Amino acid sequence: MATKQEALAIDFISQHLLTDFVSMETDHPSLFTNQLHNFHSETGPRTITNQSPKPNSTLNQRKPPLPNLSVSRTVSTKTEKEEEERHYRGVRRRPWGKYAAEIRDPNKKGCRIWLGTYDTAVEAGRAYDQAAFQLRGRKAILNFPLDVRVTSETCSGEGVIGLGKRKRDKGSPPEEEKAARVKVEEEESNTSETTEAEVEPVVPLTPSSWMGFWDVGAGDGIFSIPPLSPTSPNFSVISVT
């Protein structure tokens, strides 16, 4: 069905073709202009504009996303746990958290020698390495081959056996020193007794003790000397020139 505007346009064309154009324009000017305007508006070319949204070109879209460079802290905790859980040769962990070091002596049918208790497994492993190197030399399998230090004092077998013994207190002297001190004290007591026996008792000075020195006539004392005479052999004449 034709719309009202189309019907008016057809009517206008038929009147324009069949009737006089001038008379129509003069008789109905408003109708003519309205119909003409409607006709041009309907039949005129239409411009269609495609409005596409412009992409927002921002700096964030041009740059690639940066990688996440955050270092996780769990790596350090894992390494510490691995060191604690690592099993060292000759080391056993106690239920209360300490680490005990032991070694088997091949010279005594494989009997165990207790090397001590340590706070960490690394210290216990190093104690085992020193004892193993002393017993087996270069053939020993060690936990830390580069950390072993051999000295002249620890190379002897007595040092290895002494590792299992507990350290003596610094305040208590050894038994040998005690025995030496006892001997010295006995010798000093013997020498003091002999000196006391050899020393004569000292007589106190009294008037009676001086009578021997001054009693010349009795012939007892230091002044009991016979008188000198020219005929006596002790007499000598000194000639003075």
Curated annotation (Swiss-Prot):
Give GO terms: molecular function aspect only.
DNA-binding transcription factor activity; transcription cis-regulatory region binding
Which Gene Ontology terms of cellular component type are present? Answer: nucleus
- Polar residues bias: start-end ranges: 44-61
Q: Which UniProt keywords apply?
A: Activator, DNA-binding, Ethylene signaling pathway, Nucleus, Transcription, Transcription regulation
Q: Where in the cell is it found?
A: Nucleus
The feature table lists the DNA-binding region at 87-145
Ranges where the record places region Disordered? 37-87, 162-203
Q: What does this protein do?
A: Probably acts as a transcriptional activator. Binds to the GCC-box pathogenesis-related promoter element. May be involved in the regulation of gene expression by stress factors and by components of stress signal transduction pathways.
Q: What is this protein called?
A: Ethylene-responsive transcription factor ERF104
